[in-house]
Amino acid sequence: LCYAIDVDAINAAFLMGMAQMTDQWAVPGSATYNDSLNHFTYDPEKAKSLLAEAGYADGFTTNIITISGMSDMLTAIANMLDEVGIHCNIQQVDSATNNQYMKDGTWEGLMLHFATIAPDLGLYMGRHLDKNGAYYAKGIQHPDKEMELLEEIRRCMDPDEKHKLEKEMQAAIYDAETGSCLFGRVLYVNKSSMYKYDYVIDDHATEAFTACWDLSACWLNK
């Protein structure tokens, strides 16, 4: 699946080429982004080869669940998957039903994964990875390695050691060669434009998640 999706084409066609692309639970350049991962690339032939290796040389059929606002993008993704032999039935649902699937883990097939990408995997990834998590948790596997790392991250008091553990978690899940791919292929980080007066200095706007945005060094040059 991950090799079958052309993320740059999705960005250009549906996000005006303005999305911040990523391939793990972090913004590139942030404290928890792991630069050493093996990355997924758009490689349909490799996708076909891996499907055959897994016993699906003739492909298979599954569902893609989407809300109306994302249906065009999901249809494009379905077409890409179809080219490698993964045939998808598009199932459009309302937001309430989609949210219930996320909470109950009762979806069948594929659906989008919405998550808060912030530099605290113990909290934000924990909402989805923990067996008692609020969203998606009831519909995914919970491998021992990832669960042990999650608990270590939550208990860690040293910031540097915590970031090291968080990068280990990124590798455990998102490395193209060895990762468990629990949450599928990450596409992009949603962001919006911010406008400010040019005399606002050292505010670090857009560089941090709002909940941990530090304005202590900000000053006005006027």
Regions found by a protein language model. Name each.
Residues P44-N63:
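Immediate post-signal peptide segment of exported/extracytoplasmic ligand-binding proteins
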Residues G59-S68, C88-N89:
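Short, well-ordered beta-strand elements
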Residues C2-D35, S68-A78, N99-K222:
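Detector for C-terminal structural segments
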